[in-house]
Amino acid sequence: MLNEVTVLNIREYLAATENGRFGEEELKELLSEFSCSKNADVERFLKEQAIEFTKKNQSVTYLVFHSQDASLVGYFTLAIKPICVSAKKFSNTTKRKIARVSEQRENELTYTLSAYLIAQLEKNFRNGANRKITGKQLLQAAVDTILKLQYMTGGMVFFLAVSYTHLRAHETLR
């Protein structure tokens, strides 16, 4: 099913004003079609903050479209964040791998490293668009995007920010 979706970085819309095809106003109009009554915070983020966060390089939002009818089926937002991990239970091999891309705190077995964060991830529930993609497929689109970024820029860690309440809701909405 992943070949049935197209993932677009919203920077493509913002940069397109130069050739007159799209632009920020067209992007805002497109985002207004997104609906998620199950999680008002992710809907509000997309409509009110995603563009500014992208302009400020705090994060980048990607829109996911169904390839057959070009309907907006979901979105995800990626950011790079520092994380601190305790390596007390890691094998020596894993510790060596993490040490290559992180800083170890003196006299502690904790490492601080940059990681890709899937900060937002949601399906569009307007007009049944949510039935055109599963949560697993949307997550896979985000992971595939991160893997491309890792190939181009490096890095080895990514994580998903999720609340338990929202996770349970997604499990019932497959």
Enumerate the language-model features and the residues they cover.
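Conserved GNAT acetyl-CoA-binding A-motif
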Residues: 148-161
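Conserved acetyl-CoA-binding loop-helix of GNAT-fold acetyltransferases
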Residues: 129-145
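Short amphipathic alpha-helix that is part of the acyltransferase structural core
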Residues: 2-52
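Conserved acyl-donor/pantetheine-binding loop and adjacent beta-alpha core of acyl/acetyltransferases
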Residues: 77-120
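Single conserved hydrophobic/aromatic residue that forms the stacking wall/gate
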Residues: 166-174
